[in-house]
Amino acid sequence: MSKIRKGDEVILNTGKDKGKRGTVLRVLPTGQVLVEGINVVKKHAKPNPMRGIAGGIISKEMPVDISNVALFNRATQKGDRVGFKTLDDGRKVRVFKSSGEVVDA
């Protein structure tokens, strides 16, 4: 079970986009995450009519290391660390370390 999952709202801790929030689009097996609107770079693409790719300058999100993001806690309006807790019914859930509040029900 991963501490950061697809669809989570995260905040960036370091780098050029420090303090920005975004939604996780994808968690990569290399320990990196793609976050919507974070670490956007411009790529120059050649047109490829066989694949239907138009040429030009394309803005694209690049992966960020998972250690550089923190799960956003709406109650405190800050990034928060995540831990795990086993509930009485045997389910393992993620909890915020600062408050003990369950992240996913």
From Swiss-Prot:
**Is the Ribonucleoprotein keyword given for this protein?**
yes
Signal peptide residues are none
- UniProtKB keywords: Ribonucleoprotein, Ribosomal protein, RNA-binding, rRNA-binding
Q: Which GO terms describe its cellular component?
A: ribonucleoprotein complex; ribosome
Recorded hits in Pfam families, A to Z, give: KOW, ribosomal_L24
Q: Does the keyword ATP-binding apply?
A: no
A single MF term (Gene Ontology) = rRNA binding
- What is the protein named? Large ribosomal subunit protein uL24
Q: Which organism is it from?
A: Methylobacillus flagellatus (strain ATCC 51484 / DSM 6875 / VKM B-1610 / KT)
